[in-house]
Regions:
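Solvent-exposed soluble domains appended to multi-pass membrane proteins
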Residues: 120-475
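N-terminal secretory/membrane-targeting segments
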Residues: 1-140, 157-165, 172-173, 217, ...
Length: 475
């Protein structure tokens, strides 16, 4: 795992602040106090130690109890409410002791009631009529580019009259390209790994922790498994090591037959995408068709200073990190453009449906505008579908969980037994997506739709923890 830190140095140093010294300062201060003063006191008996321990526990209880008593677990003022949704902020506000309490409560197996709830819900879904196929079996390849931290707001944005993403901008204007600019990211603690979960299995991330870390070897329904029935081979390309985010295990659980890691070929993280695209093409050219290829990029991981030659080098912004983000986004866009050109040159472009989407938000739009509050609309990531055999309107809000059922439809695998917890963009668009905090984006005002989409988070958490789909395979 240490090897995966290569190239992260600038990012790590950029994240460190003086206030972070408080993490180690109490321990150092206590050791200094102990060495200087505690040895001067005479030895105590066990009763004194027990009294000190009891007093410490009572003091901790008096400090921590009000947050639990005065607030509901769903509120951010309650430790569990904040740890569930914004774990870093929760660490700062409530500390490690509250996190241990939270872990004891939530990192557990499923109760009988939870299992019954999930099983009943899934049985209801199975009783629905089979969906009608939207297209005939076309045997086109599927190439999915999962772009690290790519968001919608830089696309078609001019800064000092200059385009940040000329390649992606041009795609938004092509008639055979579907472009959704309002895709609400629904990742949680697993971030990029959660995005792979959403797109490949149609499930939402677990409530606590990262699915890839805690439940990597569970049984999952998936896009690769659905396509395998139709004769597809599934391949995943990673810039980093397969151990990062436990991707060796999840790749296998999701049904990918081949995995190529270290596609950065020794380049630093911020320059990884160029080699990912360069070295994946020869492999795809030799691969038996039809195939499903997932390419997971890395360059956009952090907004750091680079040596890229950019038209924004002299750009003056109050937040320099936003400038760095624009420069890296410009580079990533250029890499994607070159990859598409290569596919066209080699004859793979016309034989493939190409999907480009961001894995999660990072540099949200409010930071570019200098606003402190981050709205859900500031977090949107894009979705491009090139050579789409199906057409649909693209102006509504969708969630990342809606991509999986949409890909099943577009690839003619709509007969697969699990169609995910979202809705296909080719069948129904409710203009609603629910964030992991329970907030909803979009213009939908129907309580029943919003309530159902919120319920999907609870259902998915239970399905994953109870390993529900293992029983489906065994049957």
């Amino acid at each position: 795992m240490v090897d995966n830190l290569e190239g992260l140095g600038p990012s790590v140093w950029n994240s460190i602040q003086w206030i972070d010294l408080w993490i180690v300062f109490p321990s150092i201060a206590f050791l200094a106090y102990y060495n200087k003063f505690m040895k001067l006191f005479p030895a105590r008996d066990c009763r004194t130690d027990l009294k000190l321990l009891a007093g410490s526990v009572l003091l901790i209880f008096m400090i921590e109890a009000p947050s639990y008593i005065l607030h509901k677990p769903t509120e951010y003022a309650h430790p569990h409410g904040l740890y569930r949704n914004e774990i870093i902020r929760a660490y700062k506000q409530f500390g490690f002791i509250n996190y241990w309490i939270y872990e004891v409560k939530y990192l557990r197996g499923c109760t009988t009631e939870e299992k019954m709830y999930a099983t009943k819900f899934m049985e209801t879904l199975k009783q629905k009529k089979p969906v009608t196929p939207l297209i005939e079996d076309h045997k086109k390849n599927l190439i999915l580019i999962l772009v690290e931290s790519l968001q919608s707001w830089p696309i078609n944005l001019l800064v000092d009259g200059k385009e940040i993403t000329p390649c992606l901008n041009s795609l938004t204007k092509e008639g055979d390209v579907l472009y959704f600019s309002k895709v609400l990211p629904q990742v949680k603690g697993g971030r990029s790994a959660d995005a792979q979960l959403l797109l490949n299995t149609g499930l939402l991330p677990i409530e606590t922790g990262a699915t890839a870390s805690l439940y990597a070897t569970h049984e999952y329904p998936s896009l690769p498994k659905a396509l395998a029935v139709h004769g597809y081979t599934s391949i995943s390309f990673l810039c980093d090591d397969k151990a990062y985010w436990n991707q060796e295990a999840t790749t296998k659980s999701y049904g990918f037959e081949k995995l190529y890691d270290h596609m950065a070929k020794g380049e630093l993280m911020v320059k990884a995408d160029e080699n990912l695209f360069k070295y994946s093409v020869p492999i795809l050219e030799k691969e038996q068709q039809p195939f499903y290829a997932q390419l997971v990029t890395m360059s956009g991981h952090d907004a750091i200073k680079t040596d890229f030659q950019s038209q924004f080098d002299n750009l003056k912004l109050e937040n320099v990190l936003v400038k760095y983000n624009l420069i890296i986004t410009e580079y990533v866009d250029r890499c994607i453009g070159e990859f598409i050109k290569t596919l066209k040159k080699d004859g793979l472009y016309e034989k493939s449906i190409i999907v480009i989407t961001g894995d999660h938000d990072a540099m949200s739009y409010n930071r570019y505008e200098g606003r402190e509050k981050c709205e859900l609309s500031d977090r949107y990531v894009p979705l491009f579908i090139l050579n789409s055999p199906l057409k649909t309107k693209c102006d509504k809000v969708i969630g990342q969980s809606d991509i999986y059922p949409s890909l099943l439809d577009i690839m003619g695998a709509d007969d697969y037994y699990f169609r995910g917890l979202g809705e296909s963009i080719f069948r129904n668009q409710s203009d609603c997506a629910v964030y992991h905090t329970g907030e909803n984006a979009g213009r939908c005002q129907e309580d029943s739709i919003i309530r159902k989409k919120k319920e999907m988070w609870k259902l998915s958490d239970i399905l994953i923890r109870m390993n529900y789909f293992k029983s489906c395979v065994e049957r």
